[in-house]
Amino acid sequence: MNVLEQVIENRYALYNGDSCEIAKAIPDNSIHYTIFSPPFASLYTYSNSDRDMGNSKGDDEFYNHFIFLAKELYRVTMPGRLLSFHCMDLPLMKERDGVIGLKDFPAIIRQIFEDCGFIYHSKVTIWKNPVTEMQRTKALGLLHKQIRKDSTMNRQGIPDYIITLRKPGENPERVSHTHESFPVNVWQNYASPVWMDIRQSDTLQKKLARDDKDERHICPLQLEVIQRCIELWTNPNDIVLDPFAGIGSVPYTAVKMGRRGIGVELKESYYNQAVNNLEIAVKGDVMECPVGQMSIEDFLTANPA
């Protein structure tokens, strides 16, 4: 396994490296749940690495690279268990794409996973304020002056989505809740097809993960989104994987909720911040392991405290 750095503690494992390579070292049917936000093709530049999927020359190259990871994620997921990804429709720009419009990026990623064998399970729309989007992007379709000019070019804002897929087979470890631990009013909120109450600012501190030499966008998942998915679809001590861990939002939340987390991140500054965040999550000393000292298999079979 080609790992640049790694930190392993009894509740989590973080790897600085290429998720396509590191996923190959994860045993079959060993991951209880995966949740992540995929790179948005060529929309953002996350790092300068030629291994970064976000640096693909075009959509076809990105999708071809992503298929390799999707196949590995199918292999490592336990039968009957779930994988969720967080993304949005992508804007088409006149100067880059030749037209103004939208690309259904979530549907393309979902189809890749279905082609690997996953079953489409559910979809949640996460409301986002269109005024904030307009102020940030100055998108033509959201400008009020366009209403006065020609409103056929106006559109609604772009929400986020959580799309969840299930691996076929019988779940060997059922996820069960009690009325007390998961009351009906909570379930009614989670069962809504639209989550209206997610605060976009509800993320881990990301300032320290920026490189001055990079351009550079970081798009951490909102903590409340991660919490809801983990609460609904996992048991305590389950292993939660994020192959694009960024600053560690998913493993951080998993550990705080009594689960175990695996995070893989290619960019060094993001990885280093993830290490700091996980140290905060466990509130104790972590065991730093030189590359090659402990395998993923060792972590998966360890008896958690």
What is the predicted function of each stretch?
Residues I108-I109, V275-A305:
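Class I S-adenosyl-L-methionine-dependent methyltransferase module
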Residues N2-Q273, I296, A305:
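Core catalytic lobe of class I
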